[in-house]
């Protein structure tokens, strides 16, 4: 068992990400998230960036769900053989 542990330690040690790489990734995330882009200050904690990123992803999921529901309702109200129905089905991946 200890040999397994030491093997794992070597593997994780070789694939560890540096603090500079983490800072770079957090900075890139900060520029991608609209809420953080709007802020005047460049100094935002990594935890805040990750929190806002998670919130942003949750909001995107909700938007996708809402749009999918709206498209489904629209599809239900169109003729199955119409061009509009074909387009909606392609958007919904049916």
From Swiss-Prot:
Query: Where, per UniProt, does this protein localize?
Result: Cytoplasm; Nucleus
Gene Ontology molecular-function annotations: protein dimerization activity
User: Where is this protein chiefly located?
Assistant: cytoplasm
Which factors induce or repress this protein, as stated in its UniProt record?
Circadian regulation with a peak of expression at midday.
Q: Which GO terms describe its biological process?
A: regulation of DNA-templated transcription; regulation of growth; response to light stimulus
Tell me the protein family, please: Belongs to the bHLH protein family.
- As given in the record, the signal peptide range reads none
Q: Name one GO cellular component term.
A: nucleus
Q: Which domain of life is it from?
A: Eukaryota
Instruction: Relate the protein's function as given in its record.
Output: Atypical and probable non DNA-binding bHLH transcription factor that regulates light-mediated responses in day light conditions by binding and inhibiting the activity of the bHLH transcription factor HFR1, a critical regulator of light signaling and shade avoidance. Forms non-functional heterodimers with HFR1, causing liberation and activation of PIF4 from the transcriptionally inactive HFR1-PIF4 complex.
Q: What else is known?
A: Gain-of-function mutants kdr-D (T-DNA tagging) show long hypocotyls, pale green and slightly narrow leaves, elongated petioles and early flowering. They are not sensitive to the gibberellin inhibitor paclobutrazol during seed germination.
Could you tell me which PANTHER family the record lists for this protein?
TRANSCRIPTION FACTOR PRE, TRANSCRIPTION FACTOR PRE6
What is known about its subunit structure? Interacts with HFR1.
**Keyword terms, alphabetized:** Cytoplasm, Growth regulation, Nucleus, Transcription, Transcription regulation
- Indicate what this protein is called per its UniProt record: Transcription factor PRE6
Please give the PROSITE patterns that the UniProt record associates with this protein: BHLH (PS50888)
Q: Positions of the region Disordered? A: 1-20
Which residue ranges does the record assign to the bHLH domain?
6-60
């Amino acid at each position: 068992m200890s040999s397994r542990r030491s093997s794992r330690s070597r593997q994780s040690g070789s694939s560890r990400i540096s603090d500079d790489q983490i800072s770079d990734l957090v900075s890139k995330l900060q520029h991608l998230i609209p809420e953080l882009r709007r802020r005047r200050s460049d100094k935002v904690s990594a935890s805040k960036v990750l929190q806002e990123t998670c919130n942003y992803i949750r909001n995107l999921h909700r938007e996708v769900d809402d749009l999918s529901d709206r498209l489904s309702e629209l599809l239900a109200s169109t003729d199955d053989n119409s061009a509009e129905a074909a387009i909606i089905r392609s958007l919904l991946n049916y």
